[in-house]
Amino acid sequence: MRKLTLIVSAVLMVLPFISSAQKQTRDYDLKVMSYNIRMGTAKDGTNSWEYRYPATAMMIQDQKPDVFGVQEAFDFQIRFIEDNFTDYDCVGVGRDNGKSEGEHMSIFWNKKTVKMIKWGTFWLSETPEKPSKGWDAACKRTATWALMKDKNTGKMFYFVNTHLDHRGSEARRQGLNLIVSRIDEINQKGYPMVLTGDFNMKPDDAALTGLEQRMQSARKIAPKTDNHATLNLWGKGKADMVIDYIYVSGFSACTEYHTITEKYGAWKYVSDHYPIYAKLIF
């Protein structure tokens, strides 16, 4: 890990836009991002994590989100981000045992702009308080939530991050319903809310109905937006679907939504999904 940190630090030092970007005046209060990082154990040839990790670092350095949720991240990928971005901290657990094993649906935040108040994780199953697989899911699935405070405005907000099942349609429907009900339970004071994640469903899926009665898709409401697919599959196969989302509620405006298709260094893709971000105003 020390070697990776040194390599990435050297790469980041030569990025021409870093110093100028830091001086730009923000026209928003909060920048949030969702990033399916692609599991670090996957055998993807030259797109495998062992080759593309510098692109992840360059993307985070370029985008500078205040808060972002990752999906499919293994413990060593979480530690890589922590080691290379000391301004950020994170919360989350491995879905397999509630500790470090398996994929993490972690939440990262910039400690200079955001303060974390409290957090928790629940499993998308009939027994959400313990590691478990629900309904017809192929895998254990979790949602991580955090109550946070924006340091500039003093505003409180909730951030929730999840990854719905890729096979079980009932697990996706029930899992999303569970998230909606938990949101209602957790957010008793009606704070602004952000939900990020890979939902493994298209925008017209009926399973989104309950969620859309409470929250809005940043992609749909932002005046500056795009309709780009979020799944790229490394440029192979059918990659024209939107399955990654940012939903929001309680903010006065969502000024921008963007699918991050930029190329970083020698890498065309930072994952088999494109990251997405939204800029929000309290």
Residue ranges and their predicted role:
Residues 2-3, 19-84, 97-102, 177, ...:
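N-terminal, active-site-proximal structural segment of metallo-dependent hydrolase catalytic domains
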Residues 10-19:
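Hydrophobic h-region of N-terminal signal peptides that target proteins for export
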Residues 29-41, 117-122, 155-165:
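Active-site-proximal beta-strand elements of phosphoester/diester hydrolases
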Residues 34-54, 100, 124-138, 165-168, ...:
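Acidic/histidine-rich helix-loop elements
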Residues 38, 74, 163-165, 199-202, ...:
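Catalytic metal-binding/acid-base residues of hydrolase active sites
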Residues 67-158, 253-260:
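Structured beta-strand-rich core segments of catalytic domains in phosphoester-bond hydrolases
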Residues 69-71, 93, 194-198, 217-220:
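Active-site neighborhood of phospho(di)ester-bond hydrolases with catalytic His/Asp-centered motifs
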Residues 170, 174, 181-193, 201-282:
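Metal-dependent phosphoester-hydrolase catalytic domains
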